[in-house]
Each structure stands twice: as C-alpha cells, then as structure tokens.
C-alpha cells in the first residue's frame, strides 16, 4: 500500500462514507420493499377472500345453470308429450267426427228401412190373412177330395178282388192244359234229339270240307305272294331302267305331277322287301282255335258280313260288346308281318298280302272252286288294296265281291232268302235289324237296323245255319299262328265272314238250294231256336285240342 500514490487513510475515509450511504439507501429500499410487501400481502389476502367468494358464487351459478338445464329438458319433454297428445286428440277428434257423420247417415238409413219394414209388415199381415182364408178353403176341398178318392179306392179294391178271382180260375185252366200237353212235349223232344244227331253228322262233313278248303286257301295265298313278289321285281326293274334313261326323273315328276317322290328310298325299300320276303315254306297251323271265345263274335257280323242273320234277337243283344271287340282287334282281318320293313307312301307291297277270306258257305262251294290254278270267277271290287303300317306291321286286305245277283234264289219254294242287299250306313246302335229287304238309304237314329251284307249277297236258311253253327270251325286260325319264312302272322282272323274276302258268292250259295229241299228248311228251323246254346258244345266235339294243317 505504500507503493500507491494515494494514501491509505484517505481511501479508508472515502470508502467508509460511501458504504454508509449505500447502507442507508439499502435500508430505505428495504423499508420501502417491506411496506410494499405488507401492502401486497394485505391486497393478496383481500383478493384471496374475494376469489373464494367469487368461486362460491361461480359454483352456485354452475349449480343453478345445471338445474336450469335439467328443468329446461324436463319442460321440453313435457312440451313434446303435450304436443303428441294434442296430435292424438286431433286424430281422435277427426275419427269421432267421421264416425258421428256415418252414424248420422246410418241413422237416417235405419229410419228409412224401419219405415219400409213397417209398410212390408202391414202388407205381410194382409197377405197372411188372405192366405189363411185360402188355406181354410183348400183344407175343406181337400177333405172332399179325400172322401171322393177313398170311395174310388174302395171300388177299385172290389174290382181288383174280382180280377184276382177271374185270373185264378184262368190260371188253373191253363195249368190243366199244360199238364195235358206234357206228353206232346216229350214226343217233340225225342224228335229234336234225333234231328240234332243228324245235324252233328252234317257238321262233321262240313268241318272236313272246311279243313280241305283252308289248305287250298293257304296254297292260293302262297301263289299270290310269289306273284306279288315277281310284280315288285318287275316294277323295280322298270324304275331302275327309267332312272338310267332319265336321270332327272324325280325332278320331272315333281315338276309335272307336283308330287315329291324319293325314288332312291323306294328302290332300297323294294330291294329289302325282295331280299327278306320268301314264300318257299309251307303254311302250318300250330294251335287249334279257341271255339268258346270266338263263338259269340262269329255269330254276330258287324261290318258287311256275307252271312245271313236269322236270329236277330240273340245277335243284337251282344252288338255293343262285339263292336268294341272289333275296334280293339282291327288287324284280325289282315295278315300282319312282324319283321317286315315299313311301308312306303306309294303303296308298293313289301311283304306277303293277306289271304282272301273264306266264304262262310263253304259246304256249298262247287268242286270247280278247289282248283288252285284258276282265279275266282266272281269279279273283284274296284276298291284298291289297302296298305297300312302300324309299328312295322304290314297289312293288306283283299276284297272280293260276289255280285251274282241273278242266281237261283227262288228255285226251291221251301227256301227263303234271309239276307238281302243293304248298303246303308248305320250311325248308331239299334235294337232291331231287318233281314228281308232291299234298301240303300242311310239310317240316322232309326228304330230298325238292317243287317249289313257284302255286295248283293243273298243266302237261304240252309246256308245260314251251316254258317252260324260252325263259325268257330271256319276260323281255324282264330287263336293260332301261321308261320311263314320271313314273317310271322298272328292268325286272329275271327271275322272271316266280314266281307273282305267273300269270293264264294251267291252263285255257289244259292246253287245248292235245290239239293236240300224240305230237309234244309226243317234243319234251319231247328237251328234258329237252338243255335246260340249248342254251338260251342257241338264244335268242341269235332276238333282235337291241337292239330296241324300242312299244305
């Protein structure tokens, strides 16, 4: 400190005076700050009190606000309920208003109805009084009628008693006359038995003739099939030659005739037929006919039959059932080839045609008929052969007409014509048929029905009995089968007398009329009465259960 230019005493004095001032200033500042701190503490305490008071007020205000909000929500919900209630009340008011209007209207209607009912009630009362008066009058008249009719019944009872007494006496007289006639009946039965034995002998001879003629017909069918096959071959050769000469033949036919024909198919079909058809084997009847099942149908001819019909009552009783049977078996009058190809549209025969049917008067056919190398002398019908195809079954029907109208129908006075020409069509089932007439009228709901016949076929009673009592024997193929090479034929030809092949016409039927005389008439009279009862028994005695017919 000695080295300094100032003296230390002076510095010490100056520093002491300055520090005092600083201390004083500091004390003053401390006092000032203390006063300010005290004032601030007081103001802070006051503000703290005010803050607490304000916080309490704020809390009370928040509680009031929450209460106000809750109250507002409650009031809003109440207001909404009141509004909905008001709407419901308005709807109810509208409904009640409409109901009130409807009730007012219904009340008016009920008043009007009440007035009407009152007037009706008055009218009904008056009507009741009137009906009561009329009812009393009716009761009185009814009592009078009752007394009158009671008296009439008493009179009728007395008359009926008298009638019974008279009839009793008459029946007693008839009984005595019947007892007296018993001896005559026994004598007649003995004579009828003898006649039946004679008829059975005639039937045996006739059946033998039938078998012979069936063999002849089988041979004729074979010859006819071979002839048909040769004709098909010739036609096929002609068509092939025409196609070679005119390649556009099919187009020309279509242009000129307006018909579309497939010649290629026809040629192929014809070749198949010629390849598959053969007539070298013989016809054999395998099974015997069912005589009992075919008896009723053979005694009843429904489609142009050539058999006379003298027992109309028995035949007409089964007409409905036989017609339905005929519809079910529409193929029985034709030869059915099961394995033949289908028929073509040009009616070219593809297999064996049906054999011509045998006339039922076979016993009266002359021996010139049995020659196989000559065709029948009766002219054929102009109706073309019919070809139908059902499930590859080929069916051909030959129809022969027997137009010998001028034969000896009246050569013998002991014979009567039993079936005459009748070309009308019957449109209905009639209970009666006429036998002895010539009529070409169409019947529409008439009470009588003529027996349809083949064209102009007239027979006598002798031929009629020969046919009707042996129809089952003529149909030898009724339930059997006829076997040929290349085809199988179901021989259900139960309607051989239906007019499709009656080649043995009236000429042969009536030429035999003079040969029988009175015996024929007696035989026909006997058979007309007992035909339907004895046919099955007689025919069953003439055939064995199984036999074969070999050509």
Curated annotation (Swiss-Prot):
Ordered alphabetically, the record's keywords are: Coiled coil, Endoplasmic reticulum, Membrane, mRNA transport, RNA-binding, Transport
Q: Give the location in the cell.
A: Endoplasmic reticulum membrane
Q: Where is this region: Disordered?
A: 1-22, 285-551
Listed under GO biological process in this entry are: endoplasmic reticulum inheritance; mRNA transport
GO molecular function annotations of the record: RNA binding
Predominant cellular place of this UniProt entry's protein: endoplasmic reticulum
Q: How does it sit in the membrane?
A: Peripheral membrane protein
Q: Which SUPFAM superfamilies match?
A: Myosin rod fragments
Indicate the segments annotated as coiled coil, or none if absent.
20-110
> Which stretches does UniProt call biased (Polar residues)?
541-551
Q: Which Pfam family would be a valid example here?
A: SHE3
Any one GO cellular component localisation term in the record? endoplasmic reticulum membrane
Which segments show compositional bias classed as Low complexity?
7-21, 309-321, 372-389, 401-413, 456-479, 490-499, 507-517, 525-540
Could you tell me what this protein does?
Answer: RNA-binding protein that binds specific mRNAs including the ASH1 mRNA, coding for a repressor of the HO endonuclease. Part of the mRNA localization machinery that restricts accumulation of certain proteins to the bud and in the daughter cell. Required for the delivery of cortical endoplasmic reticulum into the emerging bud.
The record's family statement is: Belongs to the SHE3 family.
Protein name, entry field: SWI5-dependent HO expression protein 3
Q: Say which species the protein is native to.
A: Candida dubliniensis (strain CD36 / ATCC MYA-646 / CBS 7987 / NCPF 3949 / NRRL Y-17841)
């Amino acid at each position: 400190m000695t080295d300094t230019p100032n003296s230390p005493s002076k510095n010490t004095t100056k520093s002491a005076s300055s520090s005092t001032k600083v201390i004083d200033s500091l004390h003053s500042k401390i006092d000032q700050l203390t006063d300010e701190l005290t004032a601030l503490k007081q103001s802070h305490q006051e503000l703290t009190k005010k803050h607490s008071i304000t916080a309490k007020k704020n809390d009370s205000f928040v509680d009031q606000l929450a209460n106000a909000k809750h109250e507002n929500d409650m009031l809003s919900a109440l207001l909404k309920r009141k509004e909905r209630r008001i709407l419901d009340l308005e709807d109810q008011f509208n409904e009640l208003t409409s109901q009130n209007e409807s009730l007012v209207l219904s009340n008016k209607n009920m008043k009007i109805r009440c007035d009407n009912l009152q007037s009706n009630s008055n009218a009904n009362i008056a009507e009741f009084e009137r009906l009561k008066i009329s009812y009393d009058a009716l009761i009185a008249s009814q009592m009078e009628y009752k007394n009158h009719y009671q008296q009439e019944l008493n009179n009728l009872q007395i008359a009926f008693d008298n009638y019974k007494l008279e009839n009793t006496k008459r029946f007693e007289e008839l009984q005595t006359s019947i007892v007296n006639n018993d001896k005559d009946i026994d004598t007649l039965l003995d004579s009828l038995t003898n006649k039946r034995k004679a008829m059975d002998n005639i039937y045996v001879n006739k059946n033998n003739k039938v078998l012979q003629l069936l063999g002849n017909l089988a041979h004729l069918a074979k010859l006819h099939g071979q002839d048909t096959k040769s004709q098909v071959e010739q036609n096929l050769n002609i068509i092939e030659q025409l196609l070679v000469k005119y390649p556009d033949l099919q187009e020309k036919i279509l242009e000129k005739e307006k018909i579309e024909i497939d010649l290629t198919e026809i040629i192929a079909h014809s070749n198949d037929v010629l390849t598959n058809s053969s007539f070298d084997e013989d016809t054999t009847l395998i099974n015997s006919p069912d005589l009992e099942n075919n008896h009723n149908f053979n005694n009843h001819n429904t489609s142009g039959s050539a058999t006379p019909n003298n027992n109309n009552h028995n035949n007409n009783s089964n007409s409905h059932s036989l017609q339905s049977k005929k519809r079910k078996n529409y193929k029985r009058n034709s030869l059915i080839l099961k394995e033949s190809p289908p028929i073509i549209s040009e009616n070219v025969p593809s297999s064996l045609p049906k054999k011509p049917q045998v006339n039922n008067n076979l016993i009266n056919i002359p021996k010139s008929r049995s020659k196989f190398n000559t065709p029948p002398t009766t002219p054929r019908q102009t109706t073309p052969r019919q070809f139908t195809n059902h499930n590859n079954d080929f069916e051909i029907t030959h129809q022969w007409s027997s137009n010998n109208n001028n034969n000896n129908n009246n050569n013998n006075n002991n014979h009567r014509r039993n079936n005459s020409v009748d070309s009308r069509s019957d449109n209905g089932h009639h209970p009666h048929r006429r036998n002895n007439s010539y009529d070409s009228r169409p019947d529409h709901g008439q009470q009588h029905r003529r027996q349809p016949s083949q064209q102009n076929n007239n027979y006598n009673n002798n031929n009629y009995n020969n046919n009707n009592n042996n129809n089952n024997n003529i149909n030898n193929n009724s339930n059997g089968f006829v076997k040929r090479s290349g085809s199988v034929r179901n021989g259900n030809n139960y309607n051989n007398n239906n007019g499709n092949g009656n080649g043995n016409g009236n000429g042969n039927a009536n030429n035999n009329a003079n040969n029988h005389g009175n015996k024929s008439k007696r035989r026909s009279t006997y058979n007309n009465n007992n035909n339907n009862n004895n046919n099955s028994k007689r025919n069953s005695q003439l055939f064995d259960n199984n036999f074969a017919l070999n050509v």
